[in-house]
């Protein structure tokens, strides 16, 4: 029953517009379900399985509603429920002066809104917060994550210009 509820939440997040934000692509929250039995063979029935859900809420939404539904489903089924990491989504208006200033320094015309989590969620107390950097997100967070050296050099150049602009 717990996994059924996790699947219901996943499907609701995909189909219910109250969980969508069209500034992002894709416009849906992330509710990524994983199950680990810690077995090495498919014909072994383990004494315990672990269900993990990677949840990335969208700005302006109360993700605690879904966390509480999950907690209640776990309690109803006698399961342990923990939230090891929790952070608010990062959002800075792409038309604000700070973003415009970064765009000018970066030599770019337009900011884009991205739909992935970062460690920046731990820095949301900062008043001016954006995520920027080199490379392609398509190369990141894969089993063979990598970045081209020319992209790394471009990133170092951008960070140098930003530091010189605000710190020197």
Predicted regions and their residues:
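Metal-dependent amide/peptide-bond hydrolase catalytic core
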Residues: 1-168
